[in-house]
Swiss-Prot record:
Residues that coordinate or bind ATP: G11, P12, T13, A14, A15, G16, K17, S18
Protein name listed in UniProt: tRNA dimethylallyltransferase
Region (Interaction with substrate tRNA) location: 36-39, 160-164, 244-249
Source species: Bordetella pertussis (strain Tohama I / ATCC BAA-589 / NCTC 13251)
One Pfam family, short name: IPPT
Lineage of source species: Bacteria, Pseudomonadati, Pseudomonadota, Betaproteobacteria, Burkholderiales
Length: 313
């Protein structure tokens, strides 16, 4: 029996996924499962380009505002939530559409997860305290001694991944690279076939211009004030996944007095461009990928046509 097809609308940041999603919802009885590690957080609306109340009124949207910024949300939790939602949406006679740009979530859903240790809050706090004293490059150098293969692919300032790699070394007693080469854990195979509609730019410079324009629009809409509200909370700090989101960590540094606003803006745009590059690298390796030029004037219409072809009769 052929597995049921599930459509994924993916693409780099600023590719126009939201506009395409709304157009698709006008034609089919969709429910959106958001594949985004930033829009899960309550109170983080401007910097995540979260769908507005009016947009949410047009189509049911799931996995928005499901965590406080002080909380974490793992790829394993996403996988369980997404599989549950897909089944529930099908049971209602509607069509699930996975939409977003967190590629680790897509990977977890398609392939299952590696048998890596769960996060340890106490150990993470210890690593964050050491990084505050020594800097993340020093911890990157430590990782290079423990797990050279992982350290070689990480920037010395990639705090989130350095922290996770060191955490795994400590908890598992062996390098993360060695664990990733081992057997995958016993996740049940996904009962679905995933078809990716991939919004990709035909010209990189044009996407970069879009990214800069969008970041400036977020600043004009009140991004600094949004982050200021988070910054005032004593339970939030730069080691949390929410604060490490692109745009938020740069504004946090500005509010800490480490950099001026112009520098924060430049760093935010640069970090968004780097994120888009990583997203595109992942997308280009996906099977059953239908490419749509997100810069085309009729990109939304092309997405609708691609969806019509991808859905089973």
């Amino acid at each position: 029996m052929t597995p049921r097809a599930i459509i994924c609308l993916a693409g780099p940041t600023a590719a126009g996924k939201s506009a395409s999603t709304l157009a698709l919802a006008q034609r089919w009885p969709l429910e959106i499962i958001n594949v985004d590690s930033a829009t899960i957080y309550r109170g983080m609306d401007i910097g995540t380009a979260k769908p507005s109340a009016a947009e949410r009124a047009q189509v049911p949207q799931h996995l928005l505002d499901i965590r406080d910024p002080a909380q974490s949300y793992s790829a394993a939790e996403f996988r369980a939530d997404a599989l549950r939602l897909i089944a529930e949406i099908h049971a209602r006679g509607r069509i699930p559409l996975l939409a977003g740009g967190t590629m680790l979530y897509y990977k977890a859903l398609r392939e299952g997860l590696d048998d890596l240790p769960q996060a340890d809050p106490a150990l993470r706090a210890e690593l964050e305290a050491r990084a505050a004293r020594l800097g993340w490059p020093a911890l990157h150098a430590e990782l290079a001694l423990l797990d050279p293969a992982t350290a070689a692919r990480l920037s010395p300032n990639d705090s989130q991944r350095i922290q996770r790699a060191l955490e795994i070394c400590r908890l598992a007693g062996q390098p993360m690279s060695a664990l990733l080469q081992g057997e995958r854990r016993g996740d049940a195979p996904s009962p679905y076939r995933y078809v990716t509609l991939s919004l990709e730019p035909s010209e990189r410079a044009a996407l970069h211009a879009r990214i800069a324009q969008r970041f400036d629009a977020m600043l004009a809409a009140g991004l600094v004030e949004e982050v200021r509200g988070l910054h005032a909370r004593p339970d939030l700090h730069p080691g949390l996944p929410s604060v490490r989101c692109v745009g938020y960590r740069q504004m946090w540094s500005y509010l800490d007095g480490d950099i001026d606003l112009d520098t924060a803006r430049e760093q935010g745009v640069a970090a968004t461009r780097q994120l888009a590059k990583r997203q595109l690298t992942w997308l280009r390796a996906q099977p059953e990928r239908v490419i749509i030029d997100c810069l085309a004037g009729d990109a939304v219409a092309r997405t609708v046509d691609a969806m019509a072809r991808a859905l089973p009769d």
